[in-house]
């Protein structure tokens, strides 16, 4: 279980507190270099604060168990999570570059936001109501995938008497049992790896499974099989649009298995939420733009027949089934003054189509 520690009186804990107040997403510590924070997607050095190796070790020490300290020394890298009392949660990666100690820290809220607070589309409510199927949340690193999944799982937690099993590396958000019983397993502490945890998941009587990331062929296959055998399964991929996501999964398998995987996806994939964060036009902060694919009979046939290039068209014509494209979401944000034309155009999956539909900025 991740530690909960009281904030210590040190410059580095003060940096965390200030970074959280400034809505930073990440903090980077490197021995004998200035601390760097990421705010609204942009890295910014903090002048005047240059921690030494011993200061970074002193900062990490109260967060780590003895076995984690040994693992960090033996492997030269470590993933763990931690909670700073009355402040925030941390997802921490300790590593070495050029024999220099480095720490990358992701700042996370202690309270899981509601689906309404992060403006999740109504298709996400539908996904939460399903009893089986594979739901994927995709996007680049730092696009809010973990937060989206946490909000969806907590909705299920508040509404259904079921067993929710999560497999994470490390655990990011901590859930409290409401109507559901929740089992959170952390790779390294509670299980050896994602693949082993997934193989044993079938015997742990889960109704809902969250796999932090589909990292390799084995985890992809097992996640698909879980969804196919009557479990509502959530996971993430670092892909963009929905069509690319389906192609990425299929192409991860050897050629002789790809037809079988397409058939499995056609039967088990429930939907894909693709998202990215854009800077707000006139104020600090970022806003999510999303694309939603809901797998109806038509989309299922497109996947089965390997006509993946038709997925985007299916989304464009699928508004009755709660679908919309990334370009549609970006156009809404631009036309309503949330983001600039330039930011929306940079984020568009189809820039030519976006220019034609929304024109040049006035």
Name each model-derived stretch.
Residues 1-362:
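Short, flexible helix-loop junctions that flank or precede catalytic/ligand sites
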């Amino acid at each position: 279980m991740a530690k909960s520690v009281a904030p210590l009186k040190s410059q580095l804990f003060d940096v965390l507190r200030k970074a959280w107040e400034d809505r930073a997403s990440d903090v980077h510590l490197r021995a004998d270099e200035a601390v760097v924070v990421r705010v609204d997607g942009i890295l910014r050095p903090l002048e005047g604060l240059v921690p030494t190796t011993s200061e970074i070790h002193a900062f990490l020490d109260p967060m780590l168990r003895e076995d984690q300290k040994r693992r960090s020394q033996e492997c030269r890298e470590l993933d763990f999570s931690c909670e700073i009392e009355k402040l925030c949660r941390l997802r921490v990666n300790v590593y070495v570059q050029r024999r220099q100690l480095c720490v990358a820290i992701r700042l996370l809220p202690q309270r899981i936001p509601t689906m309404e607070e992060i403006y999740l589309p109504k298709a996400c409510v539908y996904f939460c109501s399903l009893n089986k199927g594979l739901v994927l949340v995709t996007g680049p690193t730092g696009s809010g995938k973990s937060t989206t999944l946490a909000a969806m799982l907590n909705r299920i937690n508040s509404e259904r008497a079921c067993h929710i099993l999560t497999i994470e590396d490390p655990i990011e958000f901590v859930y409290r049992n409401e109507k559901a019983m929740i089992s959170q397993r952390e790779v390294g502490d509670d299980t050896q790896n994602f693949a082993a945890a997934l193989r044993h998941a079938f015997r742990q009587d889960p109704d809902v499974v969250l796999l932090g990331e589909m990292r390799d062929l084995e985890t992809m296959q097992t996640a698909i099989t879980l969804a196919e055998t009557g479990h509502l399964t959530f996971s993430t991929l670092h892909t963009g649009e929905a069509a690319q996501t389906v192609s990425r999964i299929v192409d991860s398998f050897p050629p002789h298995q790809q037809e079988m995987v397409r058939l499995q996806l056609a039967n088990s994939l429930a939907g894909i939420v693709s998202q990215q964060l854009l800077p707000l036009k006139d104020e600090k902060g970022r806003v999510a733009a999303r694309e939603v694919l809901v797998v109806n009979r038509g989309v299922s046939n497109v996947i089965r027949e390997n006509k993946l290039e038709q997925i985007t068209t299916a989304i464009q014509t699928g508004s009755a089934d709660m679908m919309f494209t990334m370009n549609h979401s970006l156009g809404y944000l631009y036309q309503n003054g949330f983001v600039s034309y330039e930011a929306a155009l940079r984020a568009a999956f189809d820039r030519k189509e976006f220019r034609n539909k929304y024109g040049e900025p006035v």
